[in-house]
Amino acid sequence: MRNNKGFTLIELLVVMIIIGLLAALVGPRFIRQEEKAKVKAAKAQIELLSTALDTFRLDVGRYPTSQEGLEALRTQPGGLERWDGPYLKKEVPTDPWGKPYVYKSPGEHGPFDILSYGADGTAGGDGDNRDITSWEK
């Protein structure tokens, strides 16, 4: 009798099929969790930017204009004597999808609007592609 110490081709195929099935079941759930984490990160960054904008307003007496943008939280706009920044420790963040946040002041929903266009980078959308905004908590 021969003493074979290896796996047969059938055994290897069965293991590969099981691994493939597990990956097919777990993979989409992992991707959804990653997108949920990005949405939560965008909401947290918008909250951080909102707090910095409120501090800017307390010092200067107004929010940065749309032209000055969020960069006014890092570098002093011309003609502002009471600017006491920088109001962010690091550079103005991009959204979790690598795109800049949209800032409007005055805003349509409050004194300012901050939004990310989500995963697809375009206005509107549903699910992972929906916009993340400062006015929707």
List each model region and its residues.
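Short, intrinsically disordered low-complexity segments
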Residues: M1, P28-I31, V39, F56
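N-terminal single-pass transmembrane signal-anchor helix
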Residues: R2-F30
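Short, compositionally biased strand/turn segments
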Residues: G6, E71-A72, Q76
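A structural feature recognizing the 12-helix transmembrane core of secondary solute carriers
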Residues: F7, R29, Q33-K36, K43, ...
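Phosphate-coordinating loops and pocket residues in cytosolic domains that bind phosphorylated ligands
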Residues: G27, R32, E68, T75
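Short, surface-exposed interaction loops/tails
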Residues: K36-K40, E47, T51-D54, V60, ...
